[in-house]
Amino acid sequence: MRLKDLIDTLTEQAKERLLSSNREHQFTPEALDKTAHQIGLAALKFADLQHDPKQNYQFDIDKFMRFEGKTGPYLQYAAVRIQSLLEKANLDSSGKSAIQSPADLPESARDVCIHLTRFPEIIQESLAHKSPNILCEAAFQLAQSFSRFYNAAPILTESNQSVRILKINLCQQTF
C-alpha cells in the first residue's frame, strides 16, 4: 500500500469515527475533513514511533485508530481536553498557589508532577538510544496520569482558589 493511500484510509476512518460519535454538529465540513486528517496522521505517526525501531510490528489500522489506549488519537484527545480546559479557565498564568508542599497535592496531581519532572531525562534517554518509542511510552503514561487527575477531582469548579490555581497551572505544564 502506498503511503498516500494509507493516509487516505486513516483519514476516512477517523472521519467515520467522528461522525459516529455524534460530534459532527461541532464541525463545519472543512473542519471535519481537517480534523479527520490530523487524527489519521497522528494514528500513523504514533503507531510507527511507539515501536522499538529495531523490531518489526504489524500495522493494525483498527487498533491504531482507537481513541483509547496507546494510540495517537488518544494522545490528541488528551491534549485537546487540556486545551479546552485551559480556554475555559481563562486564568492569568501568573496566578500563584499557596500550596507549598507536595504533600498538599492530591495523589493524582502528584502522579502528573512525577511524570512531568521525568520528561527531560526521558527525552535524553530517547535521544541517546535513538528510540522514539521511549518518548512515546512516556507521553502515553503522562496522558493516562493526567486523565486520572482530571477524573479524580474538579479542576474548574474547585472551590479553594489556591488549589484551583495549582490545578490549572499543572494543566498548563502538562499541555
Specify the residue positions occupied by each region the protein language model found.
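Non-catalytic interaction-recognition regions
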Residues: M1-F175
